[in-house]
Amino acid sequence: MDSRLALATEEPIKKDSLKKYKILCVVLLALLVIVSLGLGLGLGLRKPEEQGSCRKKCFDSSHRGLEGCRCDSGCTGRGDCCWDFEDTCVKSTQIWTCNLFRCGENRLETALCSCADDCLQRKDCCADYKTVCQGESPWVTEACASSQEPQCPPGFDLPPVILFSMDGFRAEYLQTWSTLLPNINKLKTCGIHSKYMRAMYPTKTFPNHYTIVTGLYPESHGIIDNNMYDVHLNKNFSLSSVEKSNPAWWSGQPIWLTAMYQGLKAACYYWPGSDVAVNGSFPTIYRNYSNSVPYERRITTLLQWLDLPKADRPSFYTIYVEEPDSAGHSSGPVSAGVIKALQSVDNAFGMLMEGLKQRNLHNCVNIIVLADHGMDQTSCDRVEYMTDYFPKINFYMYQGPAPRIRTRNIPQDFFTFNSEEIVRNLSCRKPDQHFKPYLTPDLPKRLHYAKNVRIDKAHLMVDRQWLAFRSKGSSNCGGGTHGYNNEFKSMEAIFLAHGPSFIEKTVIEPFENIEVYNLLCDLLHIEPAPNNGTHGSLNHLLKTPFYKPSHAGELSTPADCGFTTPLPTDPLDCSCPALQNTPGLEEQANQRLNLSEGEVAATVKANLPFGRPRVMQKNGDHCLLYHRDYISGYGKAMKMPMWSSYTVLKPGDTSSLPPTVPDCLRADVRVAPSESQKCSFYLADKNITHGFLYPAIKGTNESRYDALITSNLVPMYKEFKKMWDYFHEVLLIKYAIERNGLNVVSGPIFDYNYDGHFDAPDEITQYVAGTDVPIPTHYFVVLTSCKDQTHTPDSCPGWLDVLPFIVPHRPTNIESCSENKTEDLWVEERFQAHAARVRDVELLTGLDFYQEKAQPVSQILQLKTYLPTFETII
């Protein structure tokens, strides 16, 4: 068939079909319009009463205004409920908010909260009643309030304090997701917030919550982990056991008891320890923990406590929510689950602020929102198994990101278990090993994690996002977790605060959560119990600080070590051929130790720009030894300097170290021989040699002899001295260039009982062989520079910057796996691992720094509690 013919015959058929389709569409459209108009007109003409709405008629048995339907409690059984009965009368009792349908409702006795007209008088309104039903603007949209005085209703003489914990809310969440969290973001905008708050190690829930309310390190308050064993109790503690309610585990004085002991009342809607009879007492009001109670119930109950009569009303409140921690564990920190959890806690916080505003308390209450720790991603591909290191596992291991190892056979073998062998067998086993084993006394001092029998001696510091397990399949490994090194950025927690006592619209520098307890006491105008915080270090958060700190008074003033003779009465088995082989040179060198008053003033100005360290030890017999390039505080009993101080300016382009002077040591003629070390002390001990506390890294060759004297000697393990020398010869110069000069204070530390405080003489257990010269457990170095680096440290008009280190003094460098490595590959990392606060140095040495710096004491305390960090990855 011809194709043109086929096309011609098909064309009329297509046109007929199209015409029918158009007609059908028009007819259907017309019918749709007619039906719509009919329904609209019919419903519009129907009277409102005939619709049978239950609005304002819920459970009313009179049936007034209802035709053909009912709103009483029996309508469901009869099947004659009005169309909106379920939404208006049933679901309204199951929500915590008002809506336009609920406003003015009949009082629903089973409702969670009320939107009835009399709810304000009855004090049972939903938190948003005034916003929804009376047209007030919500708290979240209002401008930031500003006032020097509390805006409190009658009966609130002291602003209440609310401590709100959001478990596992890491600081980065607030930066990343703040636009999704309108309520918390408003608090951040109007109040104060820190870049982060540092959790204590291990970064776990119970240890950190209890630290926040006691101001104590976990080693001090006893809750050293979520799981632990106490050999004296012979019991195990866990979050799922009844033992967690045994007061024997809980030491210290939580803030609710501090408040109660001083005449205030306290109420806790959950907080680790609040449902335990610590010291025999519970908070005034508390609830036994249950994670099934909705956040809205917790918020509503706290608001009801604020409604109590003045005589019964608490001054301090805690509230705790489990998110976003729970979502972080199950989904990991970067997940939709965490975002949803963050929004749920933001809604809960918004509900609290709406409820406070409804009571006119939103600018009266001092509220702190914080977290206990952060969260990090984990994976089953990033797990270290002990079965890869031991042929047979014959020990018990607390697994995860902060593992501890102890004997299985408890209590019999608890104290005889060979932790040293465990640590030795786990040290430097693989080039890509993702943990470092430590005996707890050797852990970085900034962790304060050693002095408690519940802290097992063998400990692993695990790399970020890695886990350590006993064997494969022994625990869950996916999702997220926490517990890691508290310097990891992923472990950083939030801190926000708002209220009449706090400054406004300010970002503050990071601080540690041990400081929160003292802050809470200041807000409540009460005296804190002894704690590990530094009282006054957070005064800059407050408009009018309650506590005014002052410098500590010196307990031992320096004695005189005067120059009496240019030649020693006893050479102390020392020799310096370069001086002694030429008549008069040794006497000439010793005369340099006899400084005039003007020379003393000049060296003090240059080398002690912030004042000499004060000695806080009783019977700390010492004297000051002045030199042109350094000054020492010489400890007579220990026969070595307690500290040396000197300033290293930024070197010029052509500067170099003075040449070394080999085999040269001489007696310091200013110190009695009986109070001096002999050069022969180090001949018998092959593992120990002498080091110089002041390393003579500046000045002329002539001034270098000022350092080669017995009063500058300190005992050092030979392997440690390699690291010490590299630090002073290379890193110190590097830091001086970076910071435009440094003031350096260094010295020995004795902490044989590893309690974080200086030892009494009878606690020191190791000495240079055959002598009474004690061997330090650590050495400290405090580097101070000017924050404004256009100034040098000896002429700094403003804030200072500090970089302190407390380095364990050990016979080997196995911590750094340094074998076959040059110092440039490991020394700086080793020092950074042992960075500390100035306050840590003070506690370990009995010294007190910066007393002559012209700055308010509270600002000096900020400096002393600052911890340098070197982590940049989250």
From Swiss-Prot:
UniProt-annotated binding residues for Zn(2+) 2: D325, H329, H482
Region feature (Nuclease): 581-874
Tissue expression: Detected at the tip of villi in the small intestine. Detected on basophils and mast cells (at protein level). Detected in the epithelial layer of the small intestine; expression is higher in the proximal part and lower in the distal part of the small intestine.
Enzyme Commission number, as recorded: 3.1.4.1, 3.6.1.-, 3.6.1.9
Binding site for ATP: K204, N226, D275, Y289
GO BP term, pick one: negative regulation of mast cell activation involved in immune response
Cell compartments where the protein resides: Cell membrane; Apical cell membrane; Secreted
GO molecular function: ATP binding; ATP diphosphatase activity; bis(5'-adenosyl)-pentaphosphatase activity; bis(5'-adenosyl)-triphosphatase activity; bis(5'-nucleosyl)-tetraphosphatase (asymmetrical) activity; calcium ion binding; GTP diphosphatase activity; nucleic acid binding
Free-text remark on how the cofactor is bound: Binds 2 zinc ions per subunit.
Protein name (Swiss-Prot/TrEMBL): Ectonucleotide pyrophosphatase/phosphodiesterase family member 3
Species per Swiss-Prot/TrEMBL record: Mus musculus
